[in-house]
Amino acid sequence: MKTIAMTIIGAGSFGTALAIALARNGHSVLLWGYNPQHIKKLQEQRCNQVYLPDIRFPENLLLEASLETAITASDNILIAVPSHVFHQVLYNIQPYLDQHSRVIWATKGLEHGTGRFLQEVAREILGEKIPLAVFSGPTFAKELAIGWPTAMTIAASDAEFGKELQQLFHCDKSFRVYKSSDMIGVQLGGAVKNVIAIGAGISDGMGFGANARIALITRGLAEISRLGSAMGAELSTFMGMTGLGDLVLTCTDNQSRNRRFGILLGKGIDIKEAEKQIGQVVEGYLNTKEVYTLAKRIGVEMPIVEQIYQILYCGKNITEAANTLLSRTLKDEI
């Protein structure tokens, strides 16, 4: 019988934070990272000084450098890696899964290069039998790891699996977990909000005020909802944690890499230098192209996403992009 409640793949900031939160709940957790030297350092220091300095690991948080050992240690495998490596990680873990394995991901985004939902990628690689779930919501890794009050949502392909995960992560003192059956809506909210957050950051970097920021957030939510409706998501999902909640958090708090990236662009710093200053993956930059392409393919109007795409991938002047949005044909709000 497997004694590890969950194996977490990805020893970055969010994977580490989830491991700490789950271990704090009294569960045995195994954390795997691709760099053996990094894992060795985590084991020696019993904290992740690179991403979450001075937050100590609970004793029941274990470290592992062998992928095979990590995957075979638990039935529950949670993936917390950037979206552009999600496909490769699934491909790498697939040989070690068995008939009891269940896969969850906290990755936010669409597949790099194809624009596919991560659920589609998982089904293609893992087959139809393995239960799947996505874990998302308005959460910064540091606050979760510290133990400050946080809420997230789990959407699962199987209702009983979703309920088990909800109970596994939920903590009355600090971590409230909601359950959903809308995997499409939960995935979409987590992907598109990062793109809108870049726009909110650009607006603030240009010196526009709170009025402009909230207009971007509100109209950004409308764009997410339109795309979600066209993809078969439940509109109510976008008024919850993984829609409105995650969008507002990412657009307004400077812990957000996507927002900070946008601020730098708004101040006139070029893309490569902005990425360098952020120092970690900016998911919104990678996903802007995928979201824009998806919207065009299915005929959904997303003017904010389109202008951010024009800035990031076509070299459009930021002031010109802002003017394009402001000068659009007048219309009813809803």
Swiss-Prot record:
The keyword Lipid metabolism applies. InterPro entries: 6-PGluconate_DH-like_C_sf, 6PGD_dom2, G3P_DH_NAD-dep, G3P_DH_NAD-dep_C, G3P_DH_NAD-dep_N, NAD(P)-bd_dom_sf. NADPH binds at S13, F14, K108, A141, R257, V281, E283. It comes from the Bacteria. GO terms for cellular component: cytosol. Keywords: Cytoplasm, Lipid biosynthesis, Lipid metabolism, NAD, NADP, Nucleotide-binding, Oxidoreductase, Phospholipid biosynthesis, Phospholipid metabolism. The active site is at K193 (proton acceptor). One of its GO terms (molecular function) is glycerol-3-phosphate dehydrogenase [NAD(P)+] activity. It is found in: Cytoplasm. Its EC number is 1.1.1.94. Its main location: cytoplasm. Belongs to the NAD-dependent glycerol-3-phosphate dehydrogenase family. This is Glycerol-3-phosphate dehydrogenase [NAD(P)+]. It comes from Bartonella tribocorum (strain CIP 105476 / IBS 506).
